[in-house]
Amino acid sequence: MSFEIGGLRTTNERLLIMNKKKIDYRFKILYAVAILMVVAGHCDGGGISLDFAQWFPYEGIHLALFTFCSGYFFKDAALKRPGRYVCKKLRTLILPMYGYTIAYGLLVRLLHRWGFQIGGKFNLHNILISPLNDGHQFVLNMAGWYIVPLFMVEILNCMIRAFFKRKGWQIPEWIFFAGAVLIGMGGNFLAIMEYRTSWWLTVVRILYFAPF
């Protein structure tokens, strides 16, 4: 039972609210480190050199770090209703992706009218299909390529775990990790063999992020 005295909640209720709003600042720091890595890796294109890859080869792991941070907050409660989890991810990742794709497409179309030659045409293929297998169609939205692989890795992780849970199979966590590492190695192998165009590119990206 809860009650208020002079507008103040009971101590237990205040503690409960504080716990719900508790922030893990370790992951805030990890996100900040990953952002700095991404910025440093792309500064050369603007004439500023912040690249320290000669000291530490970070360019292959900064987005993987984002994937790790996202996966850390996965809750087993999602395994009870995986359909709801999928709908949530569609709402928070895929729908916004298509929203900003349309916005960037309209901006690029406007720039074309002003004489700027940047990005592709504003058509159904570039709006609906290209975000799934490339993500570079309007140039200005190039960073959006990461959304689909992240979405697929999160969905596959949930679906695989939910399948085993419903079967009643207790799979040790190290087996999940070992399998994911093998999948990631398969993605690297496909990339080395130059299977990294069109839909193959999407597959390689998903496989690469699987271990994280």
Name each region found by the language model:
Residues 1-183:
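Membrane-cytosol interface segments of multi-pass membrane proteins
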Residues 176-212:
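Loop-centered beta-sheet repeat module
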